[in-house]
Amino acid sequence: MKIRRRIATEQSQGVVRSFLRVAQFTCFILHFTFSSAQPTVDTIIDPKLATVLLYPQIGSTVDNAARTLNVPVLNIDDQVNTPLVLEFDDLTAVYRNFRVKVIHCNADWKRSVLNDVEFTYEYNDNPITDYQLSISTKIPYYHYRYTVPRMKLPGNYVLVVYNEQNREQILFTRRFRLYAQRIGIAAGVRFSTDISRQYNDQQIELSLDYRAYQAQVTSPQDDFKVVIRQNFRDDRAVTDLHPTNVRAFDQVLEYRALDLRNTFPGGNEYRYFDTRTLFSRANYVEKISRLANRNVAYVQAGRPRSTQAYTQFDDFNGLFVIDHLESHNGAIEADYAETIFTLLIDELPGVSVYANGAFNFWALNDRNRLTYDAALGGYRGTIWLKQGVYNYNYAVTGVVPPISRSGVGPTIGNEALVEGDFSQTENDYEIFVYQRPPAARADQLIGYQRINYGKRK
């Protein structure tokens, strides 16, 4: 009932804005092109392609299920020993010829004006030739693997995978970043200094030391573009930060909390479930139905947590890993299961509910939408997911998020309504610093720092 009362006060102002955001997002996907005027996003356009993974191959992690917890952010000098690896599945179970191209982007993820030869060492249009057919799975698929070639410049990049038979048919895109550590970054996380949000938000304060890079700096307060991202999510990023103090003698820029744009909603620890085996129930799986042509996994029914006290537990901060408990060869032996999500909550008029996570690139669409079931007394939906351990949460559209002075851009979904926001939540933050050197034609990523708040021992 508390949630229904909150909706009554917020819905009138939020429904129009939320509708416009969803409509704009939908139109963007339908008219997906790579012009210099449009941003590039993580997205899967072909519904038969699934489980798109991109990660740095650290050491001998090829058989380590946790390898996908390494996000695609890499020091440019480590590309030889730690290449980026792309993996994905084709559920048509028919071999198809795929090709991949790399696009260079500026700090705002709009395509740069650079020609291929300016940022690549090799020919920038390659076939994906490493593939395997799944073994003993009820849902057959081809598993593809591709090692990303080295790039010349630090910055933002997008992998574009397309149909070899039709170069205009883009199938999916995946972002990655290469950085060169040319400046020093010192950062920390604390509760928000906004009294009204001190129990809900987290505040990141940082400073940049550019003494070793000063020859490339002409206007310190304007040259650097700072981006802060929460939990590896580009939909949870602050992009328009300006220094609050310029210490010219020390060549240091400080970013403090004068306008509170450097704050983030704390969120909650992510829910999770384990389907590494389909022969018995594992953590947060209520039931496994082993049918002749498929497996069905029922995730434990959830309830709203926004009105409850914060509870501490470990998670992957929204990520997931693919694994097959019996063989530990999840790439080709993990099966796809019809995964049922259930949220027990009163019907929310004019509101759409979604099961959300990195498995869906944090997009809210028909694939992860839940529908209300009066007999069940809650919302239920089905998503086909490969065996593994998944983090997720529940998000809604139709209600604007709580008012916050955070600089996080307008988001499509409201996660606070069901999950709540707590300043105690353990979160990862990444700081990206971009700059365009004199005479350069594109932005470069010249600094990167990852910090954690509330890590459990």
For every predicted segment, state its role.
Residues 113, 118-142, 234-242, 338-387, ...:
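Aromatic-rich carbohydrate-binding modules that target alpha-glucans
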Residues 51-102, 197-210, 329-341:
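Contiguous beta-strand segments within globular domains
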Residues 152, 163-170, 278-282, 398-418:
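Short acidic/polar inter-strand loop motif in beta-rich domains
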Residues 42-49, 177-201, 420-447:
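Low-complexity, Pro/Ser/Thr- and charge-rich linker/hinge segments at domain boundaries
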